Amino acid sequence: MKKEDMSCIDCAVKNCNKMDKTYPDFCLTTHMDEEVLNEAMECYNEDENRKVTIAAAEVEYENYCKHTRVEEIMDFAKKINAKKIGIATCVGLLKESRILADILRRHGFEVYGVCCKAGTQKKTSVGIPECCEGVGVNMCNPILQAKLLNKAKTDLNVVVGLCVGHDSLFYKYSEALTTTAVTKDRVLGHNPVAALYTADSYYSKLKKSEEE
């Protein structure tokens, strides 16, 4: 691999974190595009970005390794003064989303949720191949989820188990700031990092190239 093609993903030093080692030759920090850096840092002067950045840092610091993600979402929501929480949920995780909504309501939040099958539109109506109806005839509709939550004027949206790609469309169309409570993985109990933890053992098949 050419040095100019290498990036943070190829680094095991992490000197940018604790500053107690030496940067690798290809480090993005030591080869930084100053124009891009300045553009990024300038964005933190925008009121919402500054508020969110400070709130996120405080949530991380105040209960580091003490609060679950559900608790951190509530901590964050309070710090940005979010009163109305939107939940964009997979229909298969509606039970878990109801539990999340109950918790949020007990902590004083208003909750409005939309499941992925709302509107009951057929998959074939948007050009999805008919064979995909083998796992259900109605399409997941993340754009509708986003637009209904936009209409409800939520302050913060929370994604619960939307499919790969459907989550991308939801993030694209959501007007409110969005965070994720659950990342879907039907095989690993919605814990996709388990495949990475076991990539040298049980899931070593993931490292095989398509040619193998």
Please provide the spans of the model-predicted regions:
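Long, charge-dense
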Residues: K95-Q145
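Short, acidic/small-residue loops that bind anionic groups at enzyme active sites
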Residues: E110-K117, L169, Y173-N191
